[in-house]
Amino acid sequence: MEGYHKPDQQKLQALKDTANRLRISSIQATTAAGSGHPTSCCSAAEIMAVLFFHTMRYKALDPRNPHNDRFVLSKGHAAPILYAVWAEAGFLPEAELLNLRKISSDLDGHPVPKQAFTDVATGSLGQGLGAACGMAYTGKYFDKASYRVYCMLGDGEVSEGSVWEAMAFAGIYKLDNLVAIFDINRLGQSDPAPLQHQVDIYQKRCEAFGWHTIIVDGHSVEELCKAFGQAKHQPTAIIAKTFKGRGITGIEDKEAWHGKPLPKNMAEQIIQEIYSQVQSKKKILATPPQEDAPSVDIANIRMPTPPSYKVGDKIATRKAYGLALAKLGHASDRIIALDGDTKNSTFSELFKKEHPDRFIECYIAEQNMVSIAVGCATRDRTVPFCSTFAAFFTRAFDQIRMAAISESNINLCGSHCGVSIGEDGPSQMALEDLAMFRSVPMSTVFYPSDGVATEKAVELAANTKGICFIRTSRPENAIIYSNNEDFQVGQAKVVLKSKDDQVTVIGAGVTLHEALAAAESLKKDKISIRVLDPFTIKPLDRKLILDSARATKGRILTVEDHYYEGGIGEAVSAAVVGEPGVTVTRLAVSQVPRSGKPAELLKMFGIDKDAIVQAVKGLVTKG
């Protein structure tokens, strides 16, 4: 960024006028909608005016241009002022602002990516800065471009721990292309924010995390211009002391006005008061960006070579994941890996070894890791793969939920699933993860059962839109597929079948191998079973499951290393509900487990070979 040049008085007045027009638009829109957050918008008016019409470089009619500076409104409830900015810039018709929150309009109550100027959905507070960190990391280390990233946070959301995870990340990686603006307007939703206007404490906290920190009067366009003009070799935090409801007589800095639109009569009077301060209707044109971001193509990324496993050899799917990701990294320099200090367990360390410049260590901060991945994936700049123990992704469920709302394309690999991890005990065992990821809109849930399937899952995930989850296991199990086996999303595999099959058994990961062992044991009793590998739990191959059930007298037995709720059994039951003559019997983990050897735990919770044998015999005996 060039050195600071003080704007002349004409430019400063134009910025003041712009801020007041943004105030007016925010009040008009929320009053027309009958809901919204005008006071939260008004505290940020000067910040937004200076950012978009003095500091940022972007093409106003092409908001997602890869060269543009980025902006994340972490305090998403102030969406009306963001919409007002894009109307002021000429991208939105001003009349559209009056359709705020209507079902016929794209201007939702909080920012969402159906708006071309919104990269990530916000509104669940505390997440915007993490996404901004991902954008800034991508700009600095992958794109090596001059675009900068700005994120505005409210003081209420600074109580969220995820904010400080992001602050730490930016400080560690010296993201000097990132600016966080803290709108310290003193008031939260139901009470004052904990620090109110103690801006010096905010400053000390930010500095402790490695940020260059500046305190400003958030309603002084001159102070804001100067603060944004300071370039340092570290991220910058601007602590802007503001007043909630600034410019609204009788409401400014008053409690009990959060999320309340002004009544029509009051709004008209306030708008007249604010408008009387506007000296010129002339609008400031956006400054175009420097066009130095590289052209990127992340479509159709394929493995450079087929799998190279041997049927019968043993490998844990968690290790197969690391090998597959490292291999895929050679197909595109836009494949990146993130981990939460578990890379020697998830085997993402294999990717780091071969592609060290594309590995991001996020440390033990899973919420932030997911937000970083979302930021890295914006504008199709990268294809991120995040990994940690599957159990620890539960901590980041809100970030994953918001990633889906953001229409983000990120891939999450959770290792150490189920009781089969053994001695580490229940705190490390993922037993809720299938339920969690199945509930995410438009998600794809992979559950590979050998090394070949894992490699195919990684390749498919890289080319599948939405949130992809790959569930991997700790135990080593045999390779059961040939290297040329074709895998597709939503296509299950019949691993074992005969014309005399009496029960269809569906397992995945460890339990698929237990099912195959059970099939061998049942042969002694002249009982044949059909064994299915679903490969993806979502979407599920309903047709193959039903065809198999009909061929085995309508009997389905599911067995899974997961709790009963939300797992494979419930997915299969939902898929076949209403089908005459088809019944589903389920085996799953029924209570909080304990430490023990994997085989002991599989037996204790009734999901091992012997439990499958007994369940099959029971179904056959019933007739």
Curated annotation (Swiss-Prot):
Its cofactor is Mg(2+); Ca(2+); Mn(2+); Co(2+). One of its GO terms (biological process) is xylulose 5-phosphate biosynthetic process. It catalyses: D-sedoheptulose 7-phosphate + D-glyceraldehyde 3-phosphate = aldehydo-D-ribose 5-phosphate + D-xylulose 5-phosphate. InterPro entries: THDP-binding (IPR029061), Transketo_C/PFOR_II (IPR009014), Transketolase-like (IPR051424), Transketolase-like_Pyr-bd (IPR005475), Transketolase_BS (IPR020826), Transketolase_C (IPR033248), Transketolase_CS (IPR049557), Transketolase_N (IPR005474). The active site is at E366 (proton donor). There is a cross-link at K352 (Glycyl lysine isopeptide (Lys-Gly) (interchain with G-Cter in SUMO2)). The modification Phosphoserine is found at S104, S295, S345. Keywords: Acetylation, Calcium, Isopeptide bond, Magnesium, Metal-binding, Phosphoprotein, Thiamine pyrophosphate, Transferase, Ubl conjugation. The keyword Translocase does not apply. The record marks H37, H258 as: Important for catalytic activity. Substrate binds at H37, H258, R318, S345, H416, D424, R474. Belongs to the transketolase family. This is Transketolase. It comes from Mus musculus (Mouse).
